[in-house]
């Protein structure tokens, strides 16, 4: 991770990356031999998706996390082939997950368990995170495997390890590092006190946090604003075919409907929105409307394809999106 002092970098953190084996089966039948109509193998994990889409959009990032065994080596190989930089911790015991994703009259997933991650492995990750500089962006997303502490998000966001200068307990936001959190339930709500730069719940996750049912964008806005009052600087809520809502730290509420697309695959669409938001934010020198547009377009481009969003498709969809100011 060598670079010049002051050079900004995006880091993505995936605790349990996977090899995703995606198969299409016509009329799947339980207890019988089924033949695949199509199949592919791709690196899996929310943070990895963000890194791959950033690469597709022309932005560099460094993928962090834990890998193990032959599957871990395959994940890293494929990421590098897609243009991503990597700086993983390779753990000794076990192998990285193999997840089966089957498409047959709907989507079915069978996810593996992943390797054993030791306290020593965690210490190595924390050491890597100490090297982050002011202006960097750290994307933390996805679930926590059972071999990691339940408060792993908070440990990272609090950056509690002693700094080389001898200053303990320096938080990421206090160091000028912008954290992006894309997680569910208490993982998300417990992160708010660390003032993440961006959080991205989807509509279903927002409903789960507050125990409500939401349908319209104007119904989403007050709950997004509650999360902002709890500490998030910017709140981006994805709503599938209903579009998205962004509550910004500048006091604006932006809404947009999704461009008319035929949804092919929803896996990775939310991660693509995060990547697009960051790409748009950096390309516009911090303009939130531009970030919002690019995020929604990238998410839609992934949903309309069996592949993650590419630049050309994203830009075509971006031209079809209209942003308006939201109100309750």
Where are these regions (language model features)?
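Short, small-residue-enriched loops and turns at beta-alpha junctions
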Residues: 115-118, 144-148, 187-189, 243-244, ...
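Charged helix-capping and loop-helix junction motifs
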Residues: 123-126, 150-157, 215-221, 256-259
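Conserved N-terminal subdomain of the carbohydrate kinase-like
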Residues: 32-33, 56-137, 318-328
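Glycine-rich phosphate/adenosyl-contacting loop at the front of the ribokinase-like
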Residues: 1-64, 70-74, 328
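Conserved phosphate/ATP/ADP-binding segment of small-molecule kinases
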Residues: 156-250
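Alpha-helix C-terminal capping segments
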Residues: 52-60, 103, 279-285
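Conserved phosphate-binding/catalytic region of the ribokinase-like
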Residues: 189-190, 217-328
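Short beta-strands and strand-loop turn motifs
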Residues: 109-111, 136-142, 182, 200-205
């Amino acid at each position: 991770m060598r670079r010049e002092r002051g050079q900004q970098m995006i880091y993505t953190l995936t605790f349990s990356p996977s090899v995703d084996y995606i198969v299409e089966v016509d009329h799947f039948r339980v207890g019988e031999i089924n033949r695949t109509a199509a199949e592919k193998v791709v690196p899996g994990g929310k943070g990895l998706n963000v890194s791959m889409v950033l690469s597709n959009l022309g932005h560099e990032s460094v993928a962090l996390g834990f890998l193990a065994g032959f599957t871990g080596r395959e994940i890293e190989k494929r990421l590098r082939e897609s243009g991503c930089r990597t700086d993983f911790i390779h753990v000794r015991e076990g192998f990285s997950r193999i997840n089966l994703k089957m498409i047959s009259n709907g989507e079915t997933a069978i996810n593996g368990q992943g390797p054993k991650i030791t306290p020593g492995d965690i210490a190595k990750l924390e050491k890597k995170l100490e090297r982050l500089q002011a202006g960097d962006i750290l994307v933390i997303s996805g679930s926590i495997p059972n071999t990691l502490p339940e408060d792993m998000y908070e440990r990272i966001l609090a950056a509690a390890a002693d700094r080389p200068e001898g200053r303990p307990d320096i938080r990421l936001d206090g160091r000028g590092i912008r954290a992006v959190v894309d997680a569910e339930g208490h993982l998300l709500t417990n992160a708010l006190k660390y003032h993440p730069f961006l959080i991205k719940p989807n509509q279903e996750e927002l409903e789960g946090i507050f125990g409500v049912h939401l349908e319209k964008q104007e119904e989403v806005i007050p709950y997004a604003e509650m999360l902002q009052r709890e500490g998030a600087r910017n709140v981006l809520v994805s709503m599938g075919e209903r579009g998205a809502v962004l509550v910004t730290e500048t006091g604006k509420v932006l809404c947009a409907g999704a461009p008319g697309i035929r949804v092919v695959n929803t896996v990775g669409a939310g991660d693509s929105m995060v990547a697009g938001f960051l790409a748009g934010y950096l390309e516009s020198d911090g303009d939130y409307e531009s970030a919002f547009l690019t995020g929604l377009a990238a998410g839609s481009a992934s949903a309309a394809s069996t592949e993650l969003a590419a630049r050309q498709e994203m830009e075509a969809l971006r031209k079809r999106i209209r942003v308006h100011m939201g109100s309750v």
